Regions:
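Short phosphate-binding loop-to-helix
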Residues: 73-87, 107
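Class I SAM-dependent methyltransferase SAM-binding "motif I" and its flanking Rossmann-like core
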Residues: 109-166
Length: 291
């Protein structure tokens, strides 16, 4: 039993800490204390971490100093193995990103999963997140939501069509040079009047939240949008009880009679009824039987 206790004491601990997403005053005291006490810090961008520490008047690692290493998408696998080795030797490893919580659209979850598998303790110092911040200021339902990260550059249309029937509020990240095209694609896939909010520069001096239908927002964004951007989109409306499987098939057929291609007709019916596109597709093509 003594050997087991000694072994447990030699195991390190992984600490995932959230940094402010724009406002230095959002840095919690626990974060500043952890940065001063840390011996090993894995940062998405070491230069930006040192800039943050300087602004916050924090000496990384205190008098003894900390070993600060980079930990980002390109080196996540290799660096993760190195950090795991540190943890096995009993080191406490502090992981931070440029802004927000590690593991949320940033490296962290794979290392946390590896630690959990090996029985290495994992804890967090909660901090700001652009995901939940955008959600709560959007004015859209917050009881059920999903985070989609950055939409893919390739296959955007099919990706969004698959999400057309998602009933939960959706949160996305997007870059300034792609936001207008993405909103336009969302308007096509989800419907021009689907409510959304574009949240820009959250917690910063020029914070802005623009609300409206997707088509309206796409037109606004076409004039140019700058800064860090989060997009919140309301979920699909629940399927009306009167919309039976037979009604869905008939609706697609009616659109085809009007000259609409079947693929587009399926997308439209799914969008209008809130039924997942895959379900409408399977019904129309006889993959599943109508109920």
């Amino acid at each position: 039993m003594v050997e087991g206790a000694d072994e447990r004491r030699r195991v390190g601990r992984l600490v995932l800490a959230g940094l402010p997403i724009g406002n230095l005053e959002d840095a919690p005291p626990r974060l500043l204390h952890a940065l001063r006490e840390a011996r090993v810090i894995a940062a998405e961008d070491t230069r930006r971490l040192r800039q943050f520490a300087s602004r916050a008047d924090v000496r990384l690692g205190g008098e003894s100093g900390a070993r600060v290493v980079s930990y980002y998408d390109a080196n996540e696998s290799r660096r993760g193995d190195e950090l795991l080795a540190d943890l096995r030797r009993g080191e406490e490893v502090l992981v931070v990103t440029d802004a927000g919580m590690p593991g949320v659209s940033d490296p962290g979850y794979r290392l946390a999963a590896a630690c959990a598998e090996e029985g290495i303790p994992v804890t967090a110092i909660p901090g700001p997140s652009a995901v939940t911040t955008a959600l709560v200021v959007s004015g859209l339902p917050t009881d059920r939501f999903c985070f989609e990260g950055f939409p893919p550059r390739k296959g955007l249309r099919s990706y969004l069509e698959e999400l057309a029937g998602e009933r939960r509020t959706m949160v996305f990240f997007e870059s300034p040079h792609r936001i207008a095209a993405t909103l336009e694609a969302m308007a096509t896939a989800f419907g021009t009047d689907r409510r959304a909010a574009v949240c820009r520069e959250l917690t910063k001096t020029f914070e802005e939240v623009r609300r409206g239908g997707l088509a309206e927002l796409a037109e606004w964004a076409s004039e140019g949008v700058r800064g860090e951007i989060s997009v919140v989109v309301e979920g699909a409306r629940p399927r009306a009880e009167s919309t039976s499987d037979t009604d869905l098939i008939a609706a697609v057929g009616a659109l085809e009679d009007e000259g609409v291609r079947r693929k587009e007709a399926i997308v439209r019916v799914a969008k209008e009824t809130g039924v997942p596109k895959r379900r409408v597709y399977d019904l129309v093509h006889g993959v599943v039987e109508a109920e």
